[in-house]
């Protein structure tokens, strides 16, 4: 998996951070893993990825080489996204870290992709459980980010996608209910969003009127 995040962001430090700051941050991150119910294996892999990033960023030669690679990439692809190539065994942990680094939308999209054939995990596996949980959490956060930008219909569509995924997986009824409640609470804002659009956007207006009728 090509994870759309660099070592600095994964660890949660500034690109100018000194080694002492990086090591303190590593300790803090390892001591406070997410407590939403991920498997022990996923959290161990998360800690391992954090340590690897810290090792690279505290080694002067490795860090200099990495920073030079980042600079070359920014010069050749100004709008490109830096990525980390992760083995399959670390994918779930990488997505958890991406979600923690405020990459909720990307984490949701990649988790949903990971639950689709042909890469879907074995039924009942820890990987399936972790990806299903992450998809719910990341979907919720991504929808909140859209709400903060007043993109209410976009937030609703994210929640609908998340609910449909949870319905298909059938593993986390409580998380599904939270997404459904969030979608319901969005209804008045969706109506205003859809009805305030340009008059030429008839589809949006009709959708807004339909939601209004359903209130």
Protein language model annotation of sequence segments:
Residues 33, 73, 118-122, 159, ...:
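Alpha-helical junction/boundary sensor with strong preference for TPR arrays
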Residues 1-38, 49, 53, 64-68, ...:
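N-terminal J-domain/J-like co-chaperone modules of DnaJ/Hsp40 proteins
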Residues 104, 152, 159, 201-205:
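TPR-repeat structural position
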Residues 39, 117-130, 167-178:
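Flexible helix-coil transition and linker loops at the boundaries of alpha-helical arrays
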């Amino acid at each position: 998996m090509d994870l759309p995040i660099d070592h600095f962001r994964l660890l949660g430090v500034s690109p100018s951070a000194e080694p002492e700051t990086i090591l303190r941050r590593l300790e803090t991150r390892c001591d406070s893993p997410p407590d939403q119910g991920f498997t022990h294996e996923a959290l161990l892999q998360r800690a391992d990825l954090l340590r690897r990033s810290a090792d690279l960023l505290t080694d002067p030669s490795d860090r200099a080489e990495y920073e030079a690679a980042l600079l070359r990439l920014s010069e050749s692809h100004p709008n490109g996204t830096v990525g980390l190539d992760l083995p399959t065994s670390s994918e779930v942990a990488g997505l958890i870290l991406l979600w923690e680094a405020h990459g909720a939308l990307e984490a949701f999209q990649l988790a949903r992709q990971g639950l689709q054939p042909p890469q879907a995990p074995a039924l009942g596996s820890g990987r399936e459980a972790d990806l299903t949980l992450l998809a719910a959490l990341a979907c919720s956060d991504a929808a909140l980010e859209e709400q903060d930008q007043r993109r209410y219909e976009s937030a609703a569509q994210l929640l609908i996608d998340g609910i449909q995924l949870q319905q298909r997986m059938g593993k986390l009824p409580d998380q599904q209910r939270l997404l459904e409640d969030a979608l319901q609470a969005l209804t008045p804002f969706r109506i205003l969003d859809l009805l305030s659009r340009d008059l030429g956007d008839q589809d949006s207006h009709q959708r807004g009127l339909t939601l209004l009728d359903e209130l």
